[in-house]
């Protein structure tokens, strides 16, 4: 049994990386002593009993301006608790994790939760990715594509990098799920932010609505673009077709109401919403964006991969599925083609092997 630290910016934030970190902490605690080290805390939450939790600072401060101060405090905790391995969750805390472990025997695993092709976070983020690639003992990417990008762009050697996806909680028996081929509803799940490509989604929706006004399209998720998107939907007279549902609780339980899932993102890490859709036997149509869709969707077998950001091609594929019930059923029946590698036991096996050998 090893003592494993999980370093995060804000463990109680509501993002995907934080959700993954919580699940990982609970599961890894079955074979290790887990210490969650949260630099900051946006809100107070009751923590699971499986792991130890510590907050470094009461108020959020700039990592860039306070790097030495923050790293020194983290290092003190690592030494006092004799941590063996430190998982650094996201590039944002790479500088802290690497500096805090310098001069210690703590092994570091940098866990990338975005991808190298996403340049929207700016040069500082790219620099932090470089820090992890250069100085961490092991780099873990979400996809094989990103693994290859790290090897090419940062010259990371094969023995220092692993591709370990996030797992998907499959509480359903696929045999028990009945696909509703009569449904006339499309679903998109994702934060209302620019990276999710809602500008293109609106273009697509306008084309599809002209041909199939008897269908509807629901967008599940909240975010900074809510008001802007609401206004544009009214402007394009799409209120009856396109619906902003906001954040939906127990989202995994409503997929079965829909005919298929659409994703228009510019970038992803590993889109869990697509995996959730497949677990619920939904066909998927997605732009072939970096990274994830091409590793989840078997093109022309359980969905369509569309040339990046080609709204007309996306609309054509959506209309094709709407007009072809047999195709929807065929895609639904093959929804599980790539699911096995995302099952919890498969992913945890990789994590436990990595931690035991490092």
Region roles according to the model:
Residues 7-65, 151, 163:
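N-terminal strand-loop element at the rim of the active site
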Residues 283-287:
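Short hydrophobic beta-strand element within catalytic cores of glycosyltransferases
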Residues 88-94, 112:
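Short His-centered aromatic/hydrophobic patch
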Residues 247, 266:
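Aromatic "clamp/platform" in nucleotide-sugar-dependent glycosyltransferases that forms part
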Residues 65-72, 107, 116-135:
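Nucleotide-sugar donor phosphate/pyrophosphate-binding loop at the beta->alpha transition
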Residues 15-23, 184, 188-210, 224-230, ...:
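A conserved mid-protein helix/loop that constitutes part of the nucleotide-sugar donor-binding site
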Residues 298-300, 304-311, 320-326, 340:
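Conserved acidic donor-binding segment of nucleotide-sugar-dependent glycosyltransferases
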Residues 136-161, 168-170:
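A short, active-site helix/loop in glycosyltransferases that binds the activated sugar's phosphate group
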């Amino acid at each position: 049994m090893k003592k494993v630290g999980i370093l995060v910016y804000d463990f109680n934030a509501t993002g995907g990386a934080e959700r993954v970190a919580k699940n990982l902490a609970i599961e890894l605690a079955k074979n290790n002593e887990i210490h969650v080290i949260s630099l900051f805390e946006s809100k107070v939450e009751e923590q699971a009993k499986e792991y130890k939790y510590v907050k470094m600072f009461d108020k959020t401060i700039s990592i860039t301006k306070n790097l030495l101060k923050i790293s020194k405090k983290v290092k003190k905790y690592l030494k006092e608790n004799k941590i063996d391995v430190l998982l650094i969750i996201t590039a944002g805390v790479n500088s802290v994790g690497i500096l805090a472990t310098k001069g210690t025997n703590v092994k570091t695993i940098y866990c990338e939760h975005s991808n190298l092709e996403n340049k929207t976070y700016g040069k500082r983020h790219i620099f932090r990715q470089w820090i992890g690639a250069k100085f961490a003992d092991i780099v873990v990417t979400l996809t094989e594509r990103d693994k290859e990008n790290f090897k090419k762009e940062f010259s990371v050697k094969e023995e220092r990098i692993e591709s370990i996806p996030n797992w998907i909680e499959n509480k359903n028996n696929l045999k028990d799920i009945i696909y509703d081929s009569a449904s006339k509803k499309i679903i998109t799940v994702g934060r209302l932010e620019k990276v999710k490509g809602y500008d293109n989604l609106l273009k697509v929706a306008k084309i599809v609505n002209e041909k199939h006004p008897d269908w509807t399209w629901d967008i599940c998720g909240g975010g900074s673009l809510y008001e802007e998107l609401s206004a544009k939907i009214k402007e394009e007279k799409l209120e009856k077709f396109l619906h902003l549902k906001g954040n939906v609780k127990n989202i995994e339980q409503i997929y079965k109401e829909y005919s298929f899932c659409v994703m228009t993102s510019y970038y992803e890490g590993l889109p869990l919403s697509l995996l959730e859709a497949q677990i619920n036997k939904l066909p998927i149509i997605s732009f072939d964006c970096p990274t994830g869709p091409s590793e989840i969707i078997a093109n022309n077998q359980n969905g369509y991969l569309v040339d990046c950001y080609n709204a007309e091609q996306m609309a054509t594929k959506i209309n094709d599925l709407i007009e072809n019930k047999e195709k929807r059923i065929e895609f639904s029946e093959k929804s599980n083609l790539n699911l096995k590698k995302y099952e919890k036991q498969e992913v945890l096996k990789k994590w436990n092997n990595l931690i035991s050998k490092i």
